[in-house]
C-alpha cells in the first residue's frame, strides 16, 4: 500500500472535520435531542399526572355525590319525622280541644238543666198554690205567696 500525501491530507482533513464536528456541531445537536427528549418525557409525565388527577377528581366527585345522597336522605328522614311529630302534636291538641269543648258543653247542659229544674219547680209551686187557692177559694197576698213558693222550692 502506498501512502501518499493525498491520503495523509485526506486523513488529516477528516480528523479535523471529525474534531470540528465533535467540538461545534455535535454538542448543539445533542442538546436539541436531549431537550426534545426532556419535553417529551415531561409531556408524558404531565399526561400521566393529568390522568391521575382526573381519576382522583372522578373519585372525589363520586364520593361527594354519595355524601350528598346520604345527606339528602337524612334530611328527608328528619323532615318525615318532623312531619309525624307535627301531625301527632296536632292530633293531641285537637283531642285536648275536643275534650275541652265537650266538658264545656256538658257544663252548659248541666247549668241549663239546673235552670230548667228551678223554673219547673217554681211553676209547679205556682200551680200548686193556684190549685190550693182554688181549693181554699181565697186569695193569698203576694208576700205570703212568695214565701210559700220559696218553701216549696226548697222542699222540692
Curated annotation (Swiss-Prot):
SUPFAM superfamilies: F1F0 ATP synthase subunit B, membrane domain. GO terms for cellular component: plasma membrane; proton-transporting ATP synthase complex. It is a single-pass membrane protein. Keywords: ATP synthesis, Cell inner membrane, Cell membrane, CF(0), Hydrogen ion transport, Ion transport, Membrane, Transmembrane, Transmembrane helix, Transport. Belongs to the ATPase B chain family. F-type ATPases have 2 components, F(1) - the catalytic core - and F(0) - the membrane proton channel. F(1) has five subunits: alpha(3), beta(3), gamma(1), delta(1), epsilon(1). F(0) has three main subunits: a(1), b(2) and c(10-14). The alpha and beta chains form an alternating ring which encloses part of the gamma chain. F(1) is attached to F(0) by a central stalk formed by the gamma and epsilon chains, while a peripheral stalk is formed by the delta and b chains. This is ATP synthase subunit b. One of its GO terms (molecular function) is proton-transporting ATP synthase activity, rotational mechanism. F(1)F(0) ATP synthase produces ATP from ADP in the presence of a proton or sodium gradient. F-type ATPases consist of two structural domains, F(1) containing the extramembraneous catalytic core and F(0) containing the membrane proton channel, linked together by a central stalk and a peripheral stalk. During catalysis, ATP synthesis in the catalytic domain of F(1) is coupled via a rotary mechanism of the central stalk subunits to proton translocation. Component of the F(0) channel, it forms part of the peripheral stalk, linking F(1) to F(0). The chain crosses the membrane at residues 7-27. It is found in: Cell inner membrane. The keyword Transmembrane applies.
Amino acid at each position: 500500500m502506498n501512502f501518499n500525501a493525498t491520503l495523509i491530507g485526506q486523513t488529516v482533513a477528516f480528523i479535523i472535520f471529525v474534531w470540528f464536528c465533535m467540538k461545534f456541531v455535535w454538542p448543539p445537536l445533542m442538546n436539541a435531542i436531549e431537550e426534545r427528549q426532556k419535553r417529551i418525557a415531561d409531556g408524558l409525565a404531565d399526561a400521566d399526572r393529568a390522568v391521575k388527577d382526573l381519576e382522583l377528581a372522578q373519585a372525589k366527585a363520586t364520593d361527594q355525590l354519595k355524601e350528598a345522597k346520604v345527606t339528602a336522605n337524612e334530611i328527608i328522614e328528619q323532615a318525615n319525622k318532623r312531619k309525624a311529630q307535627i301531625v301527632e302534636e296536632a292530633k293531641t291538641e285537637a283531642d285536648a280541644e275536643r275534650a275541652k269543648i265537650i266538658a264545656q258543653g256538658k257544663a252548659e247542659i248541666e247549668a241549663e238543666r239546673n235552670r230548667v229544674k228551678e223554673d219547673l219547680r217554681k211553676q209547679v209551686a205556682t200551680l200548686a198554690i193556684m190549685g190550693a187557692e182554688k181549693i181554699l177559694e181565697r186569695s193569698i197576698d203576694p208576700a205570703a205567696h212568695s214565701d210559700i213558693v220559696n218553701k216549696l222550692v226548697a222542699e222540692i
